[in-house]
Every structure is written in structure tokens, then in C-alpha cells.
Amino acid sequence: MGMFCNQCEQAAKGVGCDIIGVCGKNPEVAALQDLMLYGLKGLAIYADKARELGVKEEKIDYFVLEGLFTTVTNVDFDPVQIAGKLRTCYDYKERIKALYETAYREKNGSSAPQITAGPAAWVIAGDLEGLVKQGQEHGINTHHADADIRSAIEILIYGLKGMAAYADHAYILGKKDEEVFAFFHKAMAATADPAKGLMDFVGLAMECGKLNIKVMGMLNEGHVAHYGHPVPTKVPTGTRKNKGILVSGHDLRMLEELLKQTDGKGIDVYPHGEMLPAHGYPGLKKYAHLYGNFGGAWQDQAKEFPHFPGAIIFNTNCIQRPADSYKDRLFSWGQVGWPGVKHINGWDFSEVINKALECPELADAPAKEILTGFGHNAVLGVADKVIEGVKAGAIKHFFLIGGCDGAKPGRNYYTELAEKVPQDCVILTLACGKYRFNKLEFGDIGGIPRLLDIGQCNDAYSALQIALALADAFKCGVNDLPLSMILSWYEQKAVVILLSLLHLGIKNIKIGPSLPAFVTPNVLNFLVENFNLGPITTVDADLKAALGQ
């Protein structure tokens, strides 16, 4: 059984994974994820039509987010779990179809036109083997016969996947938006419309970037409403003597619930990877047993997790194939899944807690502290100092160096870049790419740390607010600021953040360590001509270009 997947930066040979995914995804799971996209297209076709008649159901709207999130890199590898979601997808498609047909009949006095082919007419197979066969018939290469149009469709779909992840987090925090739900349906339905051309999908991709700013803003509002604005916070990177639970992922609401349930039980809760910024939120840092930051970025988990003796839980990506040395201590939650790993449904984490209590304690092993919590509220709180520093010449340039980390060789570029940034420049960072350099010493400029950790990948929203505020203060556009964006990417959330930046007209962005395999030469030329988007080259050359030397 073969497969083809090219959605992440680690696409084999820079083309795509066709035997097994570098991420660990096998052909069976790849086929089921392809079928999920196909099924969601069918659901979206009817949901879009129903919405035009004023008919909608929130549970169906939310499922589209869940379904797309399921197909994000390093989220769900469990075929049984995905098969269950496919059945839900089919049931919801049939339900919204029936609601649409009823509304159409009531409005027009006649039956709705029947759709007899394509994803809207999909009939689900009866067993797992049948689902896999269906998925194999609807892979990436079936999106469109024209390579450039297919590339634009993929950019749109991967942007939708990234936005779905953020919208899912926001929804869990009570933030939702009708315009966002409607766009998911419109855009997914469009990907199945043979009448749509290249510029239609370019336009939809830009619209996706625009709406993602709204979604990231909703998520920011949800975080702030629940936990307050992040504040600069020192975080120890060592361990202390106590039982422990390691939390990996991005979902702060899940972390909060775990902190509540572990309070007073002699268990420390350690953030891993993108959970590090939790320490900056007053509503989370008030828990004394939220402690430390164990390990580095996601791709090092196989080396690091065997050395964490407690329970481990993933609440979003990035999960990798677990080693036997810790698989029996590993749990998944939300959209995450791996065969043989215990999945926690709902908000009762007693199984995780009991496992942690059974496990050995961590040792007292003090280590250096790192800083986090420099969201836009904190940075703009000292904006006068920043502006004064720029005007006085103490701060010559800002570098946004961040994004996803990964295992592919070449990512040491970002370490070297951060190290070589001149002493009169400030580095903004976010997402797990920060682990390439966040334990290095950078000093400060007039009391302002030279390295400012803005937060998670979704806190690109904060980075944008900082950039827009600086542009306003200096009465110029963002492109006129002494600001360079040199980003690392890995999966689909990075794609939608890039679309958001492009929607704002931000130019001269460099991305790496390699360009997406799903971008054809013609589509790349369009991005270069319109946005001067380009790949990283060498540290010295890119620094000279950024500093105008």
C-alpha cells in the first residue's frame, strides 16, 4: 500500500512521503486522513448551501474544526479513532443535507437539485478496510489536474487546517464566530468546485490569512479573559523532588483543569515544548505546582521522555512514535491519538494523576532559568522605552526569529543567526523554534532584554500587535520598520500564519530551512513577485541583507 503526503517541511526528498511519513504516519492513516478531507468537503458543500437558507448547527460547525485539526501533522495516528470521526463526519453530512433539503423545499416549493457525484454524494464504507480503500481514491493528487491550481488548493487547505487548530483552542475557551464557521464551509466547498480557477484559490488563501488574524485574536482574548495578560516570568529548566506530570501541546484550558485536579496531591506539572508560555499567565502561574520546563522542542521527545519518570500527556501536536520505555505512562487528549496509547475523553484526568502517583519522583536537579511572558501587553507597556531606544540609536533593528522547530538538518541556522545578531538589535521569538537559542545569554539594551519570548505559535498575533504599534508610533508601514522576519516552519499552523502576514502585505519574509514541497515554481514566482518571499540562504548573507549592508 502506497501513500503520498507533502504537507510538512520534512516531506521526503523535498517532494513527499510515499512509503511512510517521516512523521510516523503509515499509509493506512494517510488514506483515512485523505478521506477525512474528502468527507469534510462533502459536508461543507451542504453546510454552505444550508447557511444561505439560514440553516446551521453549531455542533456541525465545530466538527469541521475537529476534523481538519485531526489531519494536522503529528496529531492523530490512530486508525480506529480516525474511523470513528469519519462516521461522525458522514452522519453530520447526511444531517445537514436533510436540513438543507427541507429548508429548500419550504422556500421554493420544490425539491432541491440532487448532487449525484463528488464528495457531497459520498457514502461511507462499512468497515475500516473499506474506509482505507475509499481514502486511497481521494489523495492529494486528485484535488485538481492542473499542478498550479492543485498547489493553490493545497495552500488553502493547509491554511484551513492551521486555522482550525487555533479556532478549536478558542472554542474550548468559549470564543466562536459565525463568519469564521461560514468561511470554513465556503472554502472547503470551493476546493471541490471544478469551476474555480487559480486566482479564486489565491483569493481564498488570502481570505484565510485575514480570518486567521481574527481567530488568533479570539484565542488571545480567550487566554486573557481566563488567565490575564502574560507577564515576564523566569522559568527554571531543571527539576525538583516530587511526583510529576509532563504536559505537551498547546491547550492552556486543558492544562488549567489538570492543575486544578492535581492541586495538593504532591505532583508538579511540567510544561513541555509550546506549553512553556503558560508560566507567563497570572491565572496559571498562581498554581505553585506548575513548575519548570522539561526538555526542548517536540522533535527531541524520543531522547528526552525516557528521562522523565512521571506521567506524560499530549493535548495537541506534536506526538511521535512513543518508545516502550515510556509508552505505558503516555496519554493523549483532544484530537491527539496513537495506537495503544490511552486516550482521555473529557476533563477527568484521574487516570493520568494515578499513573503519576505510581511513578518514581523526579530528582532535585536545579538548572538555569529562562524568560517567557513577553506578550504584546507587556512589550507595549514599555513601548516608550523601546521607541526612545530606537530614536537614540541604542536599538538599531528588530528580528523576529521563530516558528516551528524540526529534526531536518539545517535548522542550526537559527541558532547561529540569533548568536550573530548584533548587540544593538532586539530578537523577538515565538513557538518552539525558540528552543534553538532560548537558553543562550543575550543581555539587554537599557533594561530591555534582547531576547523577548512572545509565546506560542498563535501568539504571532502578539507579534503583529507589536509591529503595528511600532509602525503607528513611527508613522510608517510595517514594511518600513527596522524589522526583519526570518521564520522556521514545519506544519500547517505555520502556513496559515504566513498567509496572515501576506494578507497584511508584509514583504521580505524569509522562511526555512526549506521551501514547502506543495508550492510549484509558478506559485512560488507569484509569491516572490508580489511579496518578495524567499528562502533563507546563509546567516551572514541574510544578516547583511536585513541590516542593509
UniProtKB/Swiss-Prot annotation:
Binds 1 [4Fe-4S] cluster. Binds 1 hybrid [4Fe-2O-2S] cluster. It is found in: Cytoplasm. It comes from the Bacteria. Pfam families: Prismane (PF03063). One of its GO terms (biological process) is response to hydrogen peroxide. Hybrid [4Fe-2O-2S] cluster binds at residues 250, 274, 318, 404, 432, 457, 491, 493. The modification Cysteine persulfide is found at residue 404. It catalyses: A + NH4(+) + H2O = hydroxylamine + AH2 + H(+). Catalyzes the reduction of hydroxylamine to form NH(3) and H(2)O. This is Hydroxylamine reductase. The gene is hcp.
